Amino acid sequence: MEKILVTGGTVFVSRYIAEYYVKKGYEVYVLNRNHKPQSEGVHLIEADRHNLGDVLKGKHFDVVMDVTAYTGEDVNLLLDALGSFDDYILISSRAVYPETEDQPFMEETAIGENKFWGKYGTNKIEAETVLQKRVPNAYILRPPYLYGPMNNVYRETFVFDCAMQNRKFYLPKDGSMKLQFFHVKDLCRFMDVILEMKQRFLLKTG
């Protein structure tokens, strides 16, 4: 049985990913501070990713799914603490693309500061850069807005609620802004595919 390490595991995306792979029969470990209820079937590694010590030493994972890396330091600290692993998937963000670039964004689209996302986007770029230098065969995914079960942000659900209740809601400015959403289950299915291909990829998922 393959072992998967999921960083986080208690909120929305990381929790969904952990539960998804438990259901698929993987041995799933979650790395978090144990401040929230844990999902059924996961193995908890209780630690702060910024102060990991030796909790991961001597452990081997077939796949590391890094959902909670927001800076280059986050990536460095995890890599320094890990024992060994075969594949590494970083969940980055579409925020790495400048707002001035034409959509749809492509993998070869230039990355850079986005005035709407600010440091969140530039920090994600830093995380990607660190990972590419240290783990050249890593996978980097750049999803747009993620939605689905267990979402802790009242965002797309607000729009759905308004539609279901026949309530008005207002679009920013002239309503021409384009946003793309990607279901968290499709993100998992996408990871299923790339793990079967075993090549180096840097991909946007929306």
Name the predicted role of every residue range.
Residues I4-K24:
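N-terminal Rossmann NAD(P)H-binding glycine-rich loop of SDR-like oxidoreductase domains
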Residues P144-V153, K173-K185:
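Glycine-rich "substrate-gating" loop/helix at the edge of Rossmann-like oxidoreductase active sites
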Residues F160-Y170, M177-G206:
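Alpha-helical substrate-binding/gating segment
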Residues L31-H35, D48-R49:
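N-terminal Rossmann-fold cofactor-binding loop
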Residues E128-M150:
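Conserved beta-loop-beta element that borders a ligand/cofactor-binding pocket
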Residues K59-F105, I111, K115, T122-V130:
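NAD(P)-cofactor binding segment of oxidoreductase domains
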Residues G41-N51, T68-Y70:
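Rossmann-fold cofactor-recognition segment
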Residues L52-H60:
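Short amphipathic alpha-helix with an adjacent loop that forms part of the alpha/beta core around
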